[in-house]
C-alpha cells in the first residue's frame, strides 16, 4: 500500500479570495511552490505545512491528510 498526501490548500485559499501569489507572499514562498503543493506534485516539509496552516488560520490536519492510493 502506498500512501499519498491529499490537501485542501486550493479550497482554503479560494475561500479567502486569495490568488496563489497572495498566499505565497503571506507564507514567504514562491507562487510556484504553492502551485506544486496544490497540485500534489510537491509534498511540503513539516515547516512549510505548519506555516501554511498558520497563514490560513487552520489546523494543519484540516489542510493535509494521508490517503490510501493504489500501489
Residue ranges with predicted function:
Residues 1-15:
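A short, Lys/Arg-rich alpha-helix, primarily the initiator
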Residues 7, 17-18, 44-47:
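Residue-level signal for the short linker/turn that defines the boundary of a DNA-recognition helix
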Residues 14, 25, 54:
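Alpha-helical residues within the helix-turn-helix
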Residues 17-35:
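Short alpha-helical DNA-recognition segment
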Residues 47-62:
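DNA major-groove recognition helix of helix-turn-helix/homeodomain DNA-binding modules
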Residues 64-71:
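Short, charged recognition helix plus adjacent turn
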Amino acid at each position: 500500500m502506498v500512501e499519498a498526501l491529499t490537501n485542501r490548500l486550493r479550497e482554503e485559499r479560494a475561500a479567502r479570495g486569495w490568488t496563489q501569489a497572495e498566499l505565497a507572499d503571506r507564507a514567504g514562498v514562491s507562487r510556484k511552490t504553492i502551485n506544486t503543493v496544490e497540485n500534489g506534485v510537491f509534498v511540503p516539509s513539516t515547516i512549510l505545512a505548519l506555516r501554511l496552516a498558520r497563514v490560513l488560520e487552520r489546523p494543519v490536519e484540516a489542510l493535509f491528510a494521508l490517503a490510501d492510493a493504489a500501489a
